[in-house]
Amino acid sequence: MNKILTFLSVLLMVFSSQAQVKGDQKKVVEVSSLTEFRTYLNQDNVHVKLKAGNYQVDDAKKIRFFEITGNNSYFDLKGARFMVDSKLFSRPDLIKSTDGNSMYCAIEISGNHVMLEGLYIETYGDTPGLQSKNKIFNIVGEHVTLKDVELRTAGSSPWGYGYLYGLGGGDVRKMNGIRVGYPAKNVKLLGCKVHMRAMGHAIFLQGSENTLIEGCEVDGLLRTTDAMLKETSGYGFDKNFYAAKGNYIEGTNVAEDGKILPGEIISLSEDGIRMYPDYNGHPTTNTTVKNCTVTQMRRGICTGLSTSGDKVIDCVVRDCVATGYNVGNADTLINCSADAKYGEAFCIAYTDAKNAKVEMNILDSRNGIANNLLAKINGTGHHVVIKTEAPEFIPEAMAIKLSVWEGYGNFDENAKMHATDITLNNQTNTEVITFNGTENVDIKSKGKVRKATDSENEVNDSNRTKR
């Protein structure tokens, strides 16, 4: 009898749990138009499947063209393609937001526990926005996941000159990819692709917490200044090929008076994956970037501006102009790779950065232009390992330099340049040069290690004011 009662109790529990699972499952709502799709964006607990196909986005009511404000929802957009007319970003009649941020974007997700999967979205046209803060995605909710989303940006101005005419304001109108910003927490970007065909960042964070960026790919375009100087019309031609400022501009050298020089190279976009320090006083913290690739951007992966200590794991950066990895305070790079064709493979640029850990594999850096700096190390207490699979990948003219103004970073000309308490294991044949301000370093190197000459130190110090 007891066995029968036990069996019946177990059977009842099984049926109850199955009923509970069925009750928790959301009914899939299938829609086939953007009008229908919009009706579910402010609803909670929905599972929406948009029919595969091409969708034209050429009208909107607000500066956030699609606003996903509902919670606990899943949007299945696999096979759907949104073609967004860049003219929408210049519409002054669209309703402004109430969050104090005037930026235009195609899709904003402010709801919590939302997943959006599978969308291809592209901006097209050459109409620049009203302001420089345009972007495709703006994520400000908690526990939001973008999965297998693909973006292609267009519609920035002036196009074809990268950062030579400024980073925002003035004539510059950007079209960024994905922003994750305060009050976003626990956001995941999984398997996303961003094709940058506009000035702007591909993926960037401002005041977010606990962000995971995994399996994502970013690519941009490069252009030589030689090609630019051959123009017979256009924005640069009208400016007589003078940039917005002189000397060093984000990885590209111009003349002291701003004249664009031959033999240089620029990225037509900005950074691949970038952390800003904060958003309105809310710090960007605890970011992990894993198994990502960045190609042909200004900086590849830029954690250096966030001081909380971020993790970059198993990432690959190729053909970036300012630096492959911008490393900062307490950052950890594990099994990462980069080349130094057009800019240093990585830099720990800031004098106030402490205790970074870097494992860097140098990729084929031959056949580049305008760069002989393999890596630069400033700051205090870093542990760095540099290696390569083939010695011939690194040209003999390249060097690893400590305590230098050269290359990206060091914008405070009053800073005391130094590299202190550094542990460097250089497993390449590349020469290591220590400049004035290098103290208490532990260097193991296959390549020659030497102190900079007096003339080299003079040149280094002269770069202090050429940022």
Predicted segments, located by residue:
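Surface-exposed or flexible loop/turn and strand-edge residues in extracellular/cell-surface modules
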Residues: 26, 45, 52, 63, ...
